[in-house]
Amino acid sequence: MTVPSTRKDLMIVNMGPHHPSMHGVLRLIVTLDGEDVIDCEPILGYLHRGMEKIAENRTIIQYLPYVTRWDYLATMFTEAITVNAPEQLGNIQVPKRASYIRVIMLELSRIASHLLWLGPFMADIGAQTPFFYIFRERELIYDLFEAATGMRMMHNFFRIGGVAADLPHGWIDKCLDFCDYFLTGIAEYQKLITRNPIFLERVEGVGIIGGEEAINWGLSGPMLRASGIEWDLRKVDHYECYDEFDWEVQWQKEGDSLARYLVRISEMTESIKIIQQALEGIPGGPYENLEIRRFDRVKDTVWNEFDYRFISKKPSPTFELSKQELYARVEAPKGELGIFLIGDKGVFPWRYKIRPPGFINLQILPQLVKRMKLADIMTILGSIDIIMGEVDR
């Protein structure tokens, strides 16, 4: 009697592209042997809009509304890097009050981004309840944004030399109330998620990245800090006024999906600490540098004329970008967000290269999922935290 031989053909499965509200329009071509992942090939570019080329045909002020469409869940950071680069090129000083307002907005945006990472991440691994709790907290942050900027998501709030408007009356008290409330929410998450045995079973020891490996791949943000590298641009580059606050860089040694979760949860607590200190110590003074108007190329300027305030369509000042090159970067929720800017004595940048953290961090995905189970792909992909708007640009 002959025993029938079992076929051992590999199976090729397409995962995605998903809806942008989940993991974005990312397609993974996965080769499987049963449930074991043999190979994984990410296919990018479904959300490519030519953001760098658009930047080279716009002035910096005209380009500001576009940048909120890179990482549309942490728009304050894309605005910050867009104004920081020309500020450094033109040596423009930002008033102390404006710098404090920027830090408050950046840290609120960091919390909102981490919350919107945590909800779908938990849903991916089978926990539906935290998803609704997280949206409850996120709505409160968006209410604060709406009161200060007029918009819930695409804020267009940062300006070269400051911010668009001062904080409205009563906003600081509302924000302090939110900080007190949110600390209890973090404790709730710790109780609900961190010590949950089913959650730990799904994430502990899954997708391990060593410290040296993380550096070699160019990882940044929580991906790097979860691998034992204590690197945070807020401490390294001393931008804005982060040096004036008492806070610690959050990091873990294990390098797995659980470590990346713990880093982000701890970062939210540190962000609240920074916001509370900034709100209590915010100085008076102007919220924008009025001197930047001297950069206006129009010689016969009308900024100071009496009837100017009655003109419905006001011309924006334009800035000559000096003939030099510059790399500016900020610590975004997902990692190092940078811009390589080359000026050419014109109002348009000669080159505008975006360094998105999600694109760099996503490179390690095929290596992480090999020899893992099919169900672990969503755990690992979720722990990387990508937004395809900034990956594809």
Swiss-Prot record:
Membrane topology: Peripheral membrane protein
UniProt keyword annotations, A-Z: Chloroplast, Membrane, NAD, NADP, Plastid, Plastoquinone, Quinone, Thylakoid, Translocase, Transport
Family matches, as Pfam families: Complex1_49kDa
E.C. designation(s): 7.1.1.-
Swiss-Prot/TrEMBL GO biological process terms: photosynthesis, light reaction
First-listed, main subcellular location of the protein, grouped into a coarse class: plastid
Molecular function in Gene Ontology: NAD binding; oxidoreductase activity, acting on NAD(P)H, quinone or similar compound as acceptor; quinone binding
Subcellular localization: Plastid, Chloroplast thylakoid membrane
SUPFAM superfamilies: HydB/Nqo4-like
InterPro entries documented for this protein: NADH_Q_OxRdtase_suD, NADH_UbQ_OxRdtase_49kDa_CS, NDH1_su_D/H, NiFe-Hase_large
Catalytic class of the enzyme: translocase
Catalytic activity: a plastoquinone + NADH + (n+1) H(+)(in) = a plastoquinol + NAD(+) + n H(+)(out); a plastoquinone + NADPH + (n+1) H(+)(in) = a plastoquinol + NADP(+) + n H(+)(out)
GO cellular component, one term: chloroplast thylakoid membrane
UniProt family annotation: Belongs to the complex I 49 kDa subunit family.
NCBIfam families: PRK06075.1, PRK07415.1
Job description of the protein: NDH shuttles electrons from NAD(P)H:plastoquinone, via FMN and iron-sulfur (Fe-S) centers, to quinones in the photosynthetic chain and possibly in a chloroplast respiratory chain. The immediate electron acceptor for the enzyme in this species is believed to be plastoquinone. Couples the redox reaction to proton translocation, and thus conserves the redox energy in a proton gradient.
HAMAP family: NDH1_NuoD
Protein name: NAD(P)H-quinone oxidoreductase subunit H, chloroplastic
